[in-house]
């Protein structure tokens, strides 16, 4: 029996699922009657999605499709940070959607403090973009996960729990 147990708290998304989502959106945009001639482009570049389209109406339709397909592929909608649409060349609109990944330092401190305040038998360490929660019993760690899940609704990022040992 190990002396202590631990798990990591991260904020991440499955990149392959996101690629599949973008592919499905492109396919639907090319097949839908109202969007077929809009000359809409979606590009996934590093940590952002770039949408080029003809009008505000088609932009809203494409964003709705992206959110719908992401939900069906079990991607949290909290990973999307929609920037303001801007005018692009040729009377077109461009919208950049930033993808949130990793725990920000202030969020990590807030989560760490809330766990420490409620559970005295658990140690929390901030490790870059993640939190390492360590405790002597699995029950304490499960309580820590419960505390974090309750707080997740108030956060602007999704939380995942990994490396449960």
UniProtKB/Swiss-Prot annotation:
One of the record's GO molecular function terms: nucleotide binding
Ligase listed as a keyword: no
Domain of life of the source: Bacteria
Short name of one Pfam family: DUF520
UniProt keyword annotation of Transmembrane present: no
GO CC field: cytosol
Stretches that traverse the bilayer: none
Keywords: Nucleotide-binding
Protein family per UniProt: Belongs to the YajQ family.
HAMAP family per the UniProt record, alphabetical: YajQ
The protein's role, per its UniProt record: Nucleotide-binding protein.
Protein known as: Nucleotide-binding protein Pro_0479
